[in-house]
Amino acid sequence: HLCDRRQRQMCIRDRYLAYAEAANEAWGPKGDNGNGYSAYDVIKAIRKRAGIGGTSDPYLEQCAGDRDKMANLIRNERRLELCFEGFRFWDIRRWKENLNEPVRGIDWDRDGHSFNEFVVEERNYEDYMYYCPIPNSEILKFSNLVQNRGWK
């Protein structure tokens, strides 16, 4: 069934990227702890599948020796590979990135050669919003459960 196959493909990309992120955090860009695949290996395969870095991938090679650079590359790969699939909302919170970054858009001129950038939305998040509220129905079920700080 086509839909099932598409869902598996979407899921496997997330799993590969999650593994790359975890492997980089645990063992660095080229460490694999005996698993056979490092963060570097996984990202190289993902980029190769996308047609990036056929014979060489200078950006990947530049990041291969630095955990922080590799983490940034992996985050960017997640942004690109999983766009419009609902992961970005959770990734930004998990990484504790700035939630108040303005949402920007572009407006192409009629000639198609230039564009103007504009702010679509200004955001006003507070620190407690990194965590979602616990549904009240769950709090009512479990008397020892306390609502996340900042939520009522």
Predicted regions and their residues:
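Short, mixed-charge amphipathic alpha-helical segments
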Residues: 58-70
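Single conserved hydrophobic/aromatic residue that forms the stacking wall/gate
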Residues: 1-4, 8, 12
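Aromatic-residue-lined binding/catalytic grooves and analogous aromatic/hydrophobic interfacial grooves
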Residues: 28, 32-58, 85-152
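Conserved small-residue hinge/capping positions at short loops/turns
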Residues: 80-84
